[in-house]
């Protein structure tokens, strides 16, 4: 967000779950709304270590203060938990406009580097897709009389995966559930062994 010129306000983490603390978040939102002169505000909670950020409550605050909600789901694909009597799943964009994933080597799906932006609706994918291709849009489409014509409407970046990286990432999707299950087993063992430690 800093690269887009946004003023970034960090929020405390609740030590028990290790996720965003809603009380300091609301204080930050009040402060941000006072100083916000234009543009959209964004809340970006992190779902971490297989635990889902309090997305339902973050959605309530986002609506109350007129902010977008973008989940950083890099550490939580396939994660879910009960929040306020409902099952809340990471990466689904049920509560958020967007969710982001990382394909860094230590993540669940790795292909060297890169990432993905998941969108709640198909229309929300237009801007991230355009920004990943130098801000270029092709108004005529590939089947037009001028398929080569394009317009650079934003200052974007070259953030596309290579075909080799994409193939590597796709090949890991079939193993994702098994990998997450293995991590859950290991986390359970650690929790059990460390629960008796001071």
Features from the language model and the residues they span:
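Hydrophobic packing residues within well-ordered alpha-helices of enzyme cores
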Residues: 1, 55-58, 128, 190
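Substrate-binding/gating loop at the entrance of the active-site cleft, primarily
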Residues: 1-23
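Conserved donor-binding loops in enzymes that form glycosidic bonds
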Residues: 12, 48, 173
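Active-site phosphate-binding strand-loop segment of PLP-dependent enzymes
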Residues: 16-111, 116-118, 122-124
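Active-site region of PLP-dependent enzymes
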Residues: 75-88, 95-198
